A protein has these predicted regions:
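Polytopic alpha-helical membrane-helix bundles and their juxtamembrane interface segments
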Residues: 1-40, 45-194
Length: 194
């Protein structure tokens, strides 16, 4: 499972790299709404990040319910046990992003978009907390970190275009890069301990 988590986090880093590479080369196109384009990155990366978090929490707990017949926890064993829960989290994440994008594009009032997006954000994180973060006390600090960082995207959504994008860039560094490094560190530490 650790290798699967690292591979998935590498995909997140690669997609983020491509987005920022595109951003640097298209910075001259000041007419482009960078924020709305950013959502395409998020539609791919955020479900992956949520799934890697769930996998890490399952692994960290060493809970028997996630183990396969060989007594291993892996992507397949977690999905077999909890695919309905994971699909629900991914769907809630999709709606969170969809309402944000609709607000960004002006198809929905920004305040309504924020409210609806926040509802789906809270629903997805409530499920993660209930079914995965709660499995082990060591999971909770990471859960709270992710919850706080992701909540700040909602705050940044309220800023004007310039400050919103600067905030999103900073938040992406913490939610993707530092998070990926943290997961890598925790996995390395676990491997050394076992």
């Amino acid at each position: 499972i650790l290798t699967e988590i690292i591979i998935m986090e590498t995909v997140v880093q690669f997609i983020e790299f491509l987005f920022y590479l595109w951003l640097v080369f298209s910075i001259t196109a000041r007419n482009a709404n960078v924020t709305s384009i950013r959502y395409f990155d998020w539609f791919i990366t955020t479900p992956i990040m949520l799934i890697t978090t769930i996998l890490y929490f399952a692994y960290n707990s060493d809970n028997d319910r996630f183990k396969d017949k060989n007594d291993n926890i892996n992507l397949s064993s977690v999905f077999k046990k909890d695919y309905k829960i994971i699909i629900k989290i991914v769907i809630f994440n999709f709606f969170m992003l969809m309402f944000g994008l609709l607000g960004e594009l002006g198809y929905l009032d920004r305040n309504i978009a924020l409210l609806l997006g926040t509802i789906f954000f809270l629903l997805s994180f409530q499920i993660i907390y209930k079914y995965y973060s709660n499995l082990d006390e060591d999971n909770k600090p990471l859960f709270y970190f992710i919850f706080i960082i992701w909540s700040l995207y909602g705050v940044a959504f309220l800023f004007n275009y310039k400050y919103r994008n600067v905030s999103y860039n900073i938040l992406d560094i913490f939610s993707k890069n530092f998070y990926g490094l943290y997961i890598f560190y925790k996995i390395l530490k676990k491997k050394i301990e076992r």
